[in-house]
């Protein structure tokens, strides 16, 4: 019986055919000719339906549609070649390892290129593919060239014997699924096609440089003098010698901008005219040589000094046959005294996980978009990137080197989907990291402990190392992600150590770090971290390996909370060496959505389910510090503050400054007193040094003295503020000159004076109308009352939201027991008291509540007392406070408190105390609608009304929370365009609010930030001017 699945697609031992050995990547304009651009394209349901590429001619192919390379076929106009699929923890196909589905979309690409007789005579020709998803066959001029698997790894093919003078036809047959699909189950969209660059390489025939390995080692314990090792692989014998020239370094403060970075990556590299070291080796001598370098400047992420070099292959006539220009950084990575060290010093990761993503191009990310990402990271104090979960485009690593990042380079390997059936069947509930052991042990045999897949695992390990080995920014190799743990990982570790003993190896799936040099966790609680530290530290505080968090602070929607507590723990214990936030950006794909708010088409960002996938993982793909356009969210603003490399503490008439850099001093910074605008004289501080300076200032910022890298002079690195005392504005309560008109009617109570008219609905216990100077300040609009609900965040969904819904907190009702009105005393006009019980449907629990409105001529004091009674109470509440509907005369608001952005109890470190105006502040809108816009620690709030002055609000003795918005239906909205607008605004005035945490994938809200079930007593002054 013949099999309908081609053998290449179901044999994990066959990872390629005729692919050339992987070599270190370099780019040379003289060698590379881009084949990017329009290609002829046709999509077929299965390999069986696709044409025989050997018999395909250009006349037939050019009548097909065209597609741009690089791109994904699922992202073409009108989704005409199928739609994206999003999964995280599950496979989108039946598990039939190693077989892919028989119905397997197959894209056939074709184009031509021209070669003249000189090119045929002088050069060897290759085709290079930087990334094709999932696997492909290559044909040139009707002849089969080769085959390759490994979607995020490059491949080169020798096509010399297939090309001819004139027009040459290239055909690439791309298959959506194969046996390698099962080991490429990363948390992202399933997208297919030629999505990275395609190049025609022309290498000199008589001799060319095939590969280069450049390694640096310090030869003394003080890391002063170094040995530079250069190993050159030359193919061909028609050359005389090799020249190697090392040039004076460009120090780490070299100034770049986006255009200069892109220009260099396109081959337009400028060199120092001053040679540092020059060296030659004859053809018959070893092509591996070592050079002693006296006191080179070090490369670090904080000062990324690079030495450019030029490697020339010289012919017998003295001509240059080939020249390679690249750079080297002098740095040495070790595990010393249990810590990751670079150049002998411990480092701390302030990192992020970065996927390839573009909102319109998917993983076909233009280089300028990557540059934009990395510049943004530098602006936000990020010093490390984990390439999750596959190698990047090779040009990206030059950017890492130049800009200064610690990089974990990860193999293209994840098998998450093999765990999901067991997880669902057993409803596994266990504490991390025990879950890891249970899930991985049971499921490793499918792939990671399966000898049939060993070749594939090793191929991905070797490609990772051999292509990227020359980049100083890469200090750690990673064996993949969430792929259980088995014999194949052990083999990968052994191979990587053979290929490159100069770097460390990471793999989170290896709980006990048997095949890794570092312990690594994902989303642990603080208790688990501390337990692990104590279990791996002896009585003298020594340990063999550190712990990093390769994923933490899950940045899904409104969050992450408690980043400060993680960072404090990293600083406190040397055992921890920082971590990497999950993740850099949302993966939303731009599409047009029919809004449920107005029925019209609007731009939105798709997540799982928006393309009607049979299987998907929903909104879990929206979990970044940036939104889908890669613009900062409030979470990134918070992270910048928490990880700032200089700490500024202001208290008791002094300023204490601490340098938290790992290598550099504070000499590159200016410290400015924002109260006076003057510069503070701060001595040079080495890492971990502090100084305390007498000063009465309340606000200090640290900014760059000069342009450095991609950052401009004046760019803010860090800031500090004094803890300000509660500032209640001076307000004179007017004493009533004459008695107010009080009307205690059957349904309504009204109190009216010369400038104020207050009406309360006795039946509902809510303000019916509040007018000042005849203008409506607050009015009944579905009620103004004590409320507890807020729209859920993504981080509420796993537990808190379910609890709140279970206890019907969204269905709290106020049952009025009585309303009384009394004439005022001590200058007040009247006192209106509402006695009620606020409780949900179904449950016994509730609040015995007393609301007392003390009405003056120009203010209302609202005192609220709530006693929690009844059985079966919820553990906590989303919030507690009032909602007031603002009248049509509302204009804007200003506040004194934290700002200008949103803040929550566990996400507020980045928001500075100040006076802010809503006209100058734009509220952040999340790609996936949810609770947003809260302001904590507010001292007072002024709401301005046309023709009615302003309403000033403050709470005695402690700050409060507030939000002003015109949104509703946020709970039901699927995309930002679905959020409905009232056309008028409401004020949410809160006594307290629950934290946000990061429980979408991580720990719950910390105990101190939970709004626990309890009695509540609070009061607000509502003053009118």
From Swiss-Prot:
The entry's keywords: Glycosidase, Hydrolase
Annotated GO CC locations: beta-galactosidase complex
EC numbers on record: 3.2.1.23
Pfam families: Bgal_small_N, Glyco_hydro_2, Glyco_hydro_2_C, Glyco_hydro_2_N, LacZ_4
Catalytic site: 482 (proton donor), 551 (nucleophile)
An annotated GO BP: lactose catabolic process
Enzymatic class: hydrolase
Bridged cysteine pairs (disulfide): none
A GO molecular function held by the record: carbohydrate binding
SUPFAM superfamilies: (Trans)glycosidases (SSF51445), beta-Galactosidase/glucuronidase domain (SSF49303), Galactose mutarotase-like (SSF74650), Galactose-binding domain-like (SSF49785)
PANTHER family linked: BETA-GALACTOSIDASE
Protein name, per record: Beta-galactosidase
Gene coding for it: LAC4
């Amino acid at each position: 019986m013949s099999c309908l699945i081609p053998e290449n697609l179901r044999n994990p031992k066959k990872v390629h055919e005729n692919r050339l050995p992987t070599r270190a990547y370099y780019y040379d304009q003289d060698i590379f000719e881009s084949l990017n651009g329009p290609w002829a394209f046709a999509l077929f349901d299965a390999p069986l339906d696709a044409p025989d590429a050997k018999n395909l001619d250009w006349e037939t192919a050019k009548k097909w549609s065209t597609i741009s390379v690089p791109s994904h076929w699922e992202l073409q106009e009108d989704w005409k070649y199928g739609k994206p699929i999003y999964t995280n923890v599950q496979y989108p196909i039946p598990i039939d390892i190693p077989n892919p589905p028989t119905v397997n979309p197959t894209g056939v690409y074709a184009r031509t290129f021209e070669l003249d007789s000189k090119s045929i005579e002088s050069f060897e020709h290759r085709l290079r593919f930087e990334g094709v998803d999932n696997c492909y066959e290559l044909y040139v001029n009707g002849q089969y060239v080769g085959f390759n698997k490994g979607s995020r790894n490059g491949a080169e093919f020798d096509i010399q014997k297939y090309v001819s003078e004139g027009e040459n036809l290239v055909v690439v047959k791309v298959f959506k699924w194969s046996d390698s699909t099962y080991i490429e189950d990363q948390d992202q969209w399933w997208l297919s096609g030629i999505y990275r660059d395609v190049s025609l390489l022309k290498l000199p025939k008589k001799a060319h440089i095939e590969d280069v390995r450049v390694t640096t080692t310090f030869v003394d314990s003080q890391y002063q003098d170094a040995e530079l090792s250069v190993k050159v692989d030359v193919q061909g014998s028609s050359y005389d010698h090799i020249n190697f020239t090392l040039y004076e370094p460009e120090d780490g403060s070299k100034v770049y901008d986006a255009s200069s970075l892109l220009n260099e990556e396109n081959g337009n590299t400028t060199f120092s005219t001053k040679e540092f070291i020059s060296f030659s080796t004859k053809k018959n001598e070893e092509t591996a040589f070592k050079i002693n370098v006296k006191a080179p400047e070090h490369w670090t992420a904080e000062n990324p000094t690079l030495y450019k070099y030029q490697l020339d292959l010289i012919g017998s006539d003295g001509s240059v046959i080939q020249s390679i220009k690249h750079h080297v950084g002098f740095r040495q990575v070790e595990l010393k005294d249990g810590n990751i060290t670079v150049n002998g010093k411990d480092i701390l990761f302030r990192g992020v996980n970065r996927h390839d993503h573009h909102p319109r191009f998917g993983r076909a990310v233009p280089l300028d978009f990557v540059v934009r990402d990395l510049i943004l990271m530098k602006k936000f104090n990020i010093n490390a990137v984990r390439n999750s979960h596959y190698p990047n485009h090779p040009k990206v690593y030059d950017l890492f080197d130049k800009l200064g990042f610690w990089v974990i380079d990860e193999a293209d390997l994840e098998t998450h989907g093999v765990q999901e059936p067991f997880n669902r069947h057993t409803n596994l509930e266990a504490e991390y990291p025990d879950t890891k052991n249970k899930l991985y042990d049971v499921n490793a045999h499918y792939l990671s402990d399966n000898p049939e897949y060993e070749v594939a695992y090793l191929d991905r390990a070797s490609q990772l190392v051999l292509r990227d080995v020359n980049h100083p920014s890469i200090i750690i190799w990673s064996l993949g992600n969430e792929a259980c743990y088995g014999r194949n990982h052990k083999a990968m570790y052994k191979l990587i150590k053979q290929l490159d003993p100069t770097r460390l190896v990471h793999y989170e799936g290896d709980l006990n770090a048997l095949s890794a040099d570092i312990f690594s966790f994902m989303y642990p609680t603080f208790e688990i971290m501390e337990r692990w530290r104590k279990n791996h530290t002896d009585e003298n505080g020594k340990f063999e390996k550190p712990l990093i968090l390769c994923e933490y602070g899950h940045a899904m929607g409104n969050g992450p909370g408690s980043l400060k507590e993680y960072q404090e723990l990293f600083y406190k214990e040397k055992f921890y060496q920082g971590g990497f936030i999950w993740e850099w950006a949302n993966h939303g794909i731009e599409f047009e959505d029919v809004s449920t708010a107005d029925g019209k088409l609007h731009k939105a960002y798709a997540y799982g389910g928006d393309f009607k996938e049979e299987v998907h993982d929903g909104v879990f793909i929206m979990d970044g510090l940036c939104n889908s356009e890669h613009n900062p969210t409030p979470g990134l603003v918070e992270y910048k503050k928490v990880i700032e490399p200089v700490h500024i503490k202001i208290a008791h008439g002094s300023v204490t400054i601490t340098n938290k850099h790992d290598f550099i001093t504070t000499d590159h910074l200016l410290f400015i007193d924002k109260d006076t605008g003057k510069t503070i004289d701060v001595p040079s501080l080495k890492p971990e040094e502090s100084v305390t300076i007498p000063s009465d200032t309340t606000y200090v910022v640290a900014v760059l003295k000069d342009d450095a890298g991609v950052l401009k002079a004046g760019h803010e690195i860090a800031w500090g503020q004094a803890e300000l005392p509660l500032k209640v504005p001076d307000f004179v309560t007017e004493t009533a000159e004459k008695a107010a008109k009080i009307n205690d009617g059957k349904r309504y109570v009204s109190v009216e004076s010369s400038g104020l008219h207050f009406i309360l609905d006795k039946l509902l216990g809510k303000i019916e109308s509040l007018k000042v100077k005849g203008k409506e300040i607050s009015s009944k609009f579905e009620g103004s009352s004590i409320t507890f609900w807020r729209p859920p965040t993504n981080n509420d969904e796993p537990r808190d939201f379910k609890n709140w819904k279970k206890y019907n907190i969204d269905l709290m009702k106020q049952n009025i027991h009585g309303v009384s009105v009394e004439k005022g005393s001590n200058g007040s006009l009247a006192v209106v008291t509402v006695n009620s019980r606020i409780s949900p449907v179904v449950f016994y629990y509730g609040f015995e509540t007393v609301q007392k409105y003390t009405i003056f001529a120009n203010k209302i004091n609202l005192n609220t007392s709530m006693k929690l009674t009844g059985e079966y109470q919820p553990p906590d509440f989303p919030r507690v406070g009032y909602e007031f509907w603002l009248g049509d005369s509302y204009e804007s608001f200003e506040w004194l408190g934290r700002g200008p952005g949103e803040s929550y109890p566990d996400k507020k470190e980045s928001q500075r105390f100040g006076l802010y105006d809503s006209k100058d502040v734009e509220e952040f809108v999340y790609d996936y609608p949810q609770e947003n816009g809260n302001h904590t620690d507010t001292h007072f709030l002024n709401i301005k009304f046309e023709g009615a002055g302003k309403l000033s609000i403050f709470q005695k003795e402690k700050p409060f929370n507030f939000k002003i918005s015109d949104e509703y239906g946020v709970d039901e909205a699927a995309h930002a365009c679905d959020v409905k607008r009232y056309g008028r605004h409401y004020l949410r005035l809160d006594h307290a609010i629950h934290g946000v945490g990061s429980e979408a994938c991580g720990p719950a809200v910390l105990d101190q930030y939970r709004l626990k079930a309890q009695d509540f007593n609070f009061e607000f002054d509502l003053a009118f001017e």
